[in-house]
Amino acid sequence: MPKRVVAGIVTSDKMSKTRRVEIARLVKHPKYKKYIRRRTVCHVHDENNESGVGDKVEIIESEPLSKLKRWRLVRVLEKSTAVDVVALRAARKNAEAEGLAAAHAGEPETESAATDA
């Protein structure tokens, strides 16, 4: 069976010789027929530490290199700029904040708010 080759965006370069790459795809909902964004996160072996956060990279499936790493970096397709990285981090923070706000929306009122009323 041939090895899969896919493209994705580097989301983390904090580990030596390892990158976290996010592969985005669209999936059609079976009932509502709406396209939904899904993502897969892969840990990728980057022998020369060539890639950085925000870079678009091409990766290939490989034999297991560690507990999580099953992919190798083929090449960097597009280097990111500092502006791209800042925008990526800001978008991630906004998504986390919205997720927390939605989680807290269903919680009952606190004691201090109940006694003030």
Curated annotation (Swiss-Prot):
Transmembrane residue ranges: none
GO biological process: translation
Gene Ontology, cellular component aspect: cytosolic small ribosomal subunit
Keyword annotations of the record: Ribonucleoprotein, Ribosomal protein, RNA-binding, rRNA-binding
GO MF annotation list: rRNA binding; structural constituent of ribosome
CDD domains noted in UniProt: Ribosomal_uS17
Annotated region (Disordered), positions in chain: 97-117
Oligomeric and partner information: Part of the 30S ribosomal subunit.
Family from the record: Belongs to the universal ribosomal protein uS17 family.
PANTHER family from the UniProt entry: 40S RIBOSOMAL PROTEIN S11 FAMILY MEMBER, SMALL RIBOSOMAL SUBUNIT PROTEIN US17M
Job description of the protein: One of the primary rRNA binding proteins, it binds specifically to the 5'-end of 16S ribosomal RNA.
Protein name according to UniProt: Small ribosomal subunit protein uS17
Gene that this polypeptide is encoded by: rpsQ
